[in-house]
């Protein structure tokens, strides 16, 4: 009996180690601007034989519809890896350094995910935060809000929220009132909340209603008039421009590749990130 128990314990320990070494891939949902930017910048998006772009994210990936869900999942699983807006980073997870060099080995320079490295272009996984609107549907109130976001005051909030600000534009406050309906992605949550609060404090007669969705829904809503302003955590697509949208970049953001704080890995190359998220690399031992 003791021999059987020892064998059983050995099998359990072996299985536990194997499971700990297996990579648990965590992804955002289709329609997410963060996912669209991530797969493009890391090479997870590839072209098929006909030249069509295909998202090659592994079918084994766990898919979540918001930034907080991805972050929580990774924080609770030592084998997990995911990606979130750099502006949403906190101490619950660890951001990996990323090497722009697509091949592993000597010469790879691992760069920390920071606003400074995004601004300099040294950090490879970065994307714009865009707003978009239909010019013929834009109210004076919504236009003033956009102008204020691009002002020194609005861009100071951008910087305070760990995003990369633009050169501020001149702003002349207007006497405005009314409601602004905005559709945004979850990645824009921390920033949008601060911008909304500050603008409403300056303009008590303005009510900003924010509907949380994803980037694609935000762009569709702006095009069909459901939203005054749509917000996307990616580039605005050609099809969205053809629908009559006018895009405005409000800042730049990095996409942090995150792991559990208990994970010993400190950095990955773009090639390794691609291979993990396409299912070519399945064990942490392959990148340690």
What are the residue ranges of the model-derived segments?
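Exported/periplasmic ABC-transporter solute-binding proteins
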Residues: 19-288
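Positively charged n-region of N-terminal signal peptides that target proteins for export
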Residues: 1-8
């Amino acid at each position: 009996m003791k021999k059987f128990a020892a064998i059983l314990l050995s099998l359990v320990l072996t299985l536990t180690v194997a499971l700990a070494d297996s990579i648990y891939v965590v992804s955002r949902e289709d329609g997410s601007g963060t996912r669209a930017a991530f797969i493009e910048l890391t090479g997870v998006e590839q072209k098929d034989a006909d030249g069509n772009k295909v998202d090659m994210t592994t079918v084994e990936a766990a898919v979540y519809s918001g930034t907080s869900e991805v972050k929580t999942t990774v924080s609770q699983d030592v084998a997990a890896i995911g990606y979130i807006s750099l502006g949403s980073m906190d101490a619950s997870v660890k951001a990996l350094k990323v090497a722009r060099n697509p091949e592993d080995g000597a010469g790879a320079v691992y760069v920390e995910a920071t606003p400074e490295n995004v601004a300099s272009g040294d950090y490879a996984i970065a994307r714009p935060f865009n707003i978009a609107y239909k010019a013929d549907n834009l109210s004076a109130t919504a236009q003033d809000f956009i102008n204020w976001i691009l002002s020194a005051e609005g861009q100071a909030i951008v910087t305070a929220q760990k995003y990369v600000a633009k050169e501020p534009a001149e702003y002349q406050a207007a006497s405005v009132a009314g409601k602004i309906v905005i559709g945004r992605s979850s990645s824009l949550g921390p920033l949008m909340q601060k911008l909304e609060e500050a603008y409403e404090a300056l303009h008590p007669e303005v009510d900003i209603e924010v509907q949380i969705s994803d980037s694609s829904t935000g762009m569709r809503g702006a095009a069909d008039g459901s939203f005054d302003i749509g917000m996307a955590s990616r580039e605005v697509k050609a099809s969205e421009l053809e629908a009559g949208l006018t895009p405005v970049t409000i800042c730049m953001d990095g996409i942090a590749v995150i792991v559990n704080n208990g994970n010993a890995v400190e950095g990955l190359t773009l090639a390794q990130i691609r291979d993990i998220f396409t299912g070519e690399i399945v064990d942490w031992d392959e990148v340690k």
